[in-house]
Amino acid sequence: VGGSSLYPDAVNKGDQTVEKKGAGRARRPDKKRPGGDADVFTALHKRLNSVSRLDQRHLARRIKGIRKTTQADLQAKAISELETKIDKAEKQLARRIAAIPVCTYPPELPITQRRQELLETIRNNQVVVIAGETGSGKSTQLPKICLDAGLGRKGIIGHTQPRRIAARSVGARIAEELDQQIGGAVGYSVRFDNKTNDKTSIKVMTDGILLAELAHDPDLLAYDVIIVDEAHERTLNIDFLLGYLHRLLPRRPDLHVVVTSATIDTAKIAAHFEGAPIIEVSGRNFPVDIRYRPRDAEGETLDVPAAVRRSIGELTREGPGDILVFSSGEREINEICEAVRRHEPDFEVLPLYARLSSKEQQRVFGESKRRRIVVSTNVAETSLTVPGVRYVIDVGEARMSRFSQRTKVQRLPIEPISQASANQRSGRCGRLGPGIAIRLFEEEDFDARPEFTEPEIQRTNLASVILTMANQRLGSPLEFPFIDPPDPRAVTDGVRLLHELRAVRSPAVPEAGNAGRDWLTDTGRSIARLPIDPRLGRIVLAGDEEGCLFEAIIIAASLAVQDPRERPREKQKAADEAHAPFVDDRSDVLTLLHLWHLASGKRRSLNRRQFTKWCRDRFLHAQRMSEWFDTIEQLRSAVEEMGLANTYSSDFDVSLGSGSADPSNWGDDIHRAVLAGMLSQVGMRVGRSHEYLGPRNARFAIQPGSTAFETKPDWIMAA
């Protein structure tokens, strides 16, 4: 099936590619070629059995093109060049297969005891669902089991993770167990950091990286196996990937899919893939004593850092062992860490969240002579295993991406976690022996919480998904095989936003079969090629129209990452003074341009350590600054591929002090470009108050760190 759809002139029978009868009328034998042209092309097709599946597609298409060549001399030259390419492809596949290491398995992991059963089930089924408790070893051992099942030859083993930190950690662990250098037979790929090469057989990556590859490899021919790890997280990427694989598998019968989950209803996933077999693998969990210590007990309400310190005192009296604290976000984690360091000097206190540098993240997994307290987001729930943990303190909250149906704004509020998440958190202290988990909320509160976390697809803005699906001719989200369908209202809102951005031709949700590339405008197709949110992509394109493309890229990139400017609660005045040199009173947008200009110069002239110190002294987050600069370069590469002119605003250098001009004209083109992506986020001041009235009667205020906080203009545009 796969062969006939991919190679029009060939049928795939097992590992053999043979000519279809009547496929491509053979020309008369060329007397200068012993055996004639038909024999030559048959031999070329046979050689495709010894190249990778992805190379097979490209080379088979090339063979078809050469067969249509009527001039003998041109055909002979093309065949010679093709034979050279096949030679290269054969050697490349041979090198990768030769580099596959001998797999060994840690005997203490529960999954090792089920290795043979898993191997046979994966080999004999196209889809397998594995319900593996945290600590079972599923993330690190499944890729090796796939290798031992004979997979990972014609294509590689792709292993997706929902977070960059987990992709790096899992990849490094697999490489270590196989005694390999990361980036060889085992590699990882995350945004701005690719550690793979042509010998890589196991590729651990974020699900976003795999989805991005669909643009140039829609049939995922580069892969023999796709392992979708941590499916219980039900992120938008995971749900989209599972739906895409559901559609892909009938035309890729040689592709294997393994879906792993810790808490999700695995029967639902198995049913999604037409009754795929389910294998349950237990973890290494000991009994956990769960204690409820609400923050408002005993007639007083403690803030979170104080409640955490109280619980640390209780656990310290229980005996030795490291403590893992779950909090909601980066700022909350840093507040807890600072409070604990002040009052618990004997502990080594370490934060853990996705935006930490790789070096800082690795500190959590290294050895320490002191007792540790690790304060983490939900990244340590299932994605990562923090070693040495005997105790857990759970704040019971997490930041959840949520789209407001009323204001049409995507928010990141702090919300109570589900029962499944709370149980995952408490289970992290039962891997080495009996553990204790303290929950900083009431037991009645726990009982009232939902059993599972609501899938992201049911609580997020779908404009980006709708745009991607239309660009890849996947139809309407309402007809796509998602495990849980999106809210029709969210689909309508997403389509209306795309119409506002001039990305689609109609504000109405398209009927079946009409949500394809023809529904997109030229602007929509261009936005779809940019690796950012559609609103930000529209800003970039408007920057090109306004003659300030590079400034628009800088601004869009800054809005795509977390704001690098820090304003700690206890040091707000000092932070404001440090930020003053790059503040532009006219707008936060122009302030960002000043910051980029100042920081980019320092980044070129200072080494990494010096630049980090320069950022810290100015209340700038060095890691976020680096991510901002990396995103700028990624967008510059994208617009160059699109053939856009790398234009600069004529006022840009002037506004930075290199000349003189009418200040009233500075930045108008830049502001117009930003407005193109933020049309529905304009606000009018309500009387002389601090409030602004936006679309759909949404009311909001300017945050104190904004340059507009003091001036309070009559109209503002909020990004």
Which residue ranges define each predicted feature?
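Second RecA-like catalytic domain
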Residues: 345-346, 351, 393, 401, ...
